Amino acid sequence: MSDSIIELKNISVHFQNGSESIDAVKNINLAIEKGEIFGIVGYSGAGKSSLVRLINLLHHPSSGDMMIGQTKTVKNGNVLIKGKELRNLRQKIGMIFQHFNLLDQSTVLGNVLFALKHSKMSKEKRLEKAKKLVEEVGLFDRIDNHPSQLSGGQKQRVAIARALANDPEILISDEATSALDPKTTKQILELLADLNKRTGLTIVLITHEMQVVKNIANRVAVMRDGEIIEKNSTYSIFADPQKPLTKEFIESASGNQEALEKILRQPEIARLQKNEFLIQLGFSGSSTDEPLISSLAKNYGVSANILYGNVETIENIPIGTLIVVLSGTATKLKQALDEIKKQNVKLEIIKEGK
Amino acid sequence: MINWLIKVLPNVVSMGWSGDYGWWAAIYQTLYMTFFSAIIGGAIGLVFAIILVISDDDGILPNGKIFWLADKIVSIFRAIPFIILLFVISPFTQVLIGTTLGATAALVPLSLSVAPFYARQIQVVLKSVDTGKIEAAQALGANNWDILVIYMRESFPEIIRVSTVTLISLVGLTAMAGAIGSGGLGNTVVTFGQQSKYDVVWIGTIALLILIFAIQGIGDWLAKRINHADMQ
C-alpha cells in the first residue's frame, strides 16, 4: 500500500467540440502522496485545468481509473459515484481559482457559511466555525464586507477560508496566484505552505509560473499537449531539467537567460580575445561548497572574471549559476576546463574568443 | 377654480373622479391589470427562464429536448403581436374566465404576452452569472437547488432591473387591452382621442407617464440599493 491520496491510472479526457475532437488529457499516470504539495506546470491549453478537475469530478474522464483516498471514483472511464456521495467527496476536496469565484452578493462571512450549508453541525457551530476560518486567513475585521470591497489578495483569502470550511484533505489551487501581484502572491503561497505544514493538507497546485512551484512545491510535473512530459522532485527539476520545455520554464523563473542576453550585448564580450572563454557553470547541492574558481587560479593560473552569479535555495538545497570569462594560456585553459568537467559542476561553453 | 377647470378641461371634469367611467376607475383598472398580469406572467416567465438556463448545453441539467420545447414556446408567443394575441386566445379566455371582455379577461392575454418577454430577459440575466461561481459552488459540494439559489441571488439586482423594464412595457400593453373593453387609462385616452376630446388625452397621458416614471424610479433605486457587486 502506498500513501497516495490521489491516484490516476491511464486517465484520458476526450472532448468532442462539433467536428473537432480534442484530447485534453492523454493517458496520464500520477500518484500524489498524502501531505505533499504537488505542482503542475504548463502553458495555458496544456490540459492542467482539465486534469485537476478530474480529481473532484467537475470533469469526467473518457478512460482510465482513479482513486481518491480509499474511494475508487473512476473505473475504466466510468464514474462510480454520484449524487450525495459525489457531493460528500467534493466537500473533502477544496478548490481555489484564479478569479476567486466568490459570491458578490454575499458578505465574507456569507461566502464561508455557504460552504457549510450541508454540514451536519448546528447553526451556532457553523457560525462559530466560519468566523474562526475568516480569522485564520487574517480577515476578521472584514467579515461583514462584500467581495467588491476587498483587494485581490483578500478575496483569495476568503476563497481559501471557504475551501477549507469542510476540513478537506486535498486542496486544488487552479492558478490561484496568477491574478495577484508578486508580493500578494508570496503571502498567499506562504499561507498555503503554512496550512500544509500545520494540518498536513495535500495541495495540488497548477500554474504557468515556475516561480510559484519553486517556492512551495515538493514535486513538480510539467505538462504539454495533455501529457506529463517530465516529473520529479522540485529540486531535481531545477537542478537537472531534462526536457527543453522544462528548461524554458526554469529559465523564465531564474532570470539567468535574461542576464546572459545582457552580457552577450556587452562590447568586451562581443570582442572576446583569443584564449578567453565565456562559460556558464551550474552548481547544485554539495558542489556549491567547493572553492572551484579560486582553485582554477591557484592550480592552473587561469583567471576567472565573474560577470553574473545567482544562488537559489530549493527545498533547502542551494542551486547556483555563474557566468564567467576564463582567460589564460591555451594549454592551461584546456586543463582548467577538463578539471571543471571532472567536478560535479555543469559546464556550458557559451563563447570562445578568436 | 372649478369654473376655470371646467373652462380649460371640460371633458376631464365631466368624466368625474368616481363612478364606473370616472378617473379613479381608469387608474384602478390600469393598476389592476399591470399588477396581476405582472405576477402571473412574471411567474410563468421565470419558470421558463429557469428551464431554459438549466437545460441548456452548458446548464446544470442539460437536456436538449426540454430546452428545444421551452425555447420554441417562448419564441412563438414572443412573435405574436399583442393586439392579435388578444383575439387569438379569446376562446381560451372565455373558458378560463367566463367572459372575453373586461379587465379580468384582459389578464389572460396580458400574462401570456408578458411571460415570454420576461422569460427571455431573465434568461439573459441568469446566463450572465459567471460560470466560475457555479463551478466553485459545485466544487464545494452544492446540490442543484443551491446552484439555482446562487443563480438567482447573484443576479438579483439585474432581475430587478429587467423586471422594471418588463413592468413598464406591461403598462403599454394595458393601453391596447382597451380593444377588448378592459378599461384603464390607455383605453380612456384612446376613446376620448377618437372623439377629439384632447384635454382627456393630455391628462390621461400625464397620468400614465407619472406611473411609468414611478416604476422606473423605484426599480432603479432598489436595484442600486441591493447590489453589492462592482458596478459594470
UniProtKB/Swiss-Prot annotation, chain A:
Entry's localization field: Cell membrane
Keyword Translocase carried by entry: yes
Superkingdom, taxonomy of origin: Bacteria
Organism: Oenococcus oeni (strain ATCC BAA-331 / PSU-1)
GN (gene name): metN2
Domain ABC transporter positions: 6-250
One term of GO molecular function: ABC-type D-methionine transporter activity
Enzyme Commission numbers on file: 7.4.2.11
Catalytic activities: L-methionine(out) + ATP + H2O = L-methionine(in) + ADP + phosphate + H(+); D-methionine(out) + ATP + H2O = D-methionine(in) + ADP + phosphate + H(+)
Membrane-related topology note: Peripheral membrane protein
Assembly and oligomerization: The complex is composed of two ATP-binding proteins (MetN), two transmembrane proteins (MetI) and a solute-binding protein (MetQ).
Pfam families according to UniProt: ABC_tran, NIL
Main location: membrane
GO CC list: plasma membrane
Binding site for ATP: G42, Y43, S44, G45, A46, G47, K48, S49
Protein name per its UniProtKB record: Methionine import ATP-binding protein MetN 2
Primary role: Part of the ABC transporter complex MetNIQ involved in methionine import. Responsible for energy coupling to the transport system.
Sequence similarity: Belongs to the ABC transporter superfamily. Methionine importer (TC 3.A.1.24) family.
InterPro entries linked to this entry: AAA+_ATPase, ABC_transporter-like_ATP-bd, ABC_transporter-like_CS, ACT-like_dom_sf, MetN_ABC_transporter-like, NIL_domain, P-loop_NTPase
Keyword terms, alphabetized: Amino-acid transport, ATP-binding, Cell membrane, Membrane, Nucleotide-binding, Translocase, Transport
Xref: PANTHER family: AMINO ACID IMPORT ATP-BINDING PROTEIN, METHIONINE IMPORT ATP-BINDING PROTEIN METN
Class in the EC hierarchy, top level: translocase
